[in-house]
Regions:
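Nucleotide/pyrophosphate-binding catalytic subdomain
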Residues: 1-124
Length: 124
């Protein structure tokens, strides 16, 4: 089975209704014979909201704590997306980058992916 990656940005996952619409695209891809890996952004403007909270903390923006803070939005949307996939009888499992794992260049605020280990994705 061929793998396809579907990426949904913040606007596409900003509400339950919009996530349900995104799931309709996943259903179509599965019907066409694809194994679908979904990548989601934080819901709506969550990342912008988190960045505003850190205004004035420029000295810390290159720390792993800022990356952890900013990833909170993606953790919420990926978990919710997975819940709704399962509600729609599509097996879903949310993963964070460290769980897969995804290896990066360790530039916390603007990382580049070096390697993705796919065995956990393939098992789920």
């Amino acid at each position: 089975m061929n793998i396809i990656i579907k990426k949904f940005g913040g606007t596409s996952v900003s509400s339950i209704d919009k996530i349900e619409r995104a799931i309709s695209y996943i259903k179509k891809a599965r019907k066409a014979g694809y194994y679908v890996v979904v990548v989601v952004s934080a819901m709506g403007k969550d990342t912008d909201r988190l960045l505003k909270i850190t205004a004035g903390l420029d000295d810390y923006k290159k720390s792993d704590d800022i990356s952890s803070l900013l990833s909170a939005g993606e953790q919420i949307s990926s978990s919710l997306f997975s819940i709704l996939l399962n509600k729609n009888s599509i097996k879903g499992k949310s993963f964070q980058g460290w769980q897969i794992p995804i290896h990066t260049d360790l530039s916390y605020y603007n990382s580049h992916i070096l390697k993705i280990e796919t065995q956990h994705i393939k098992k789920s």
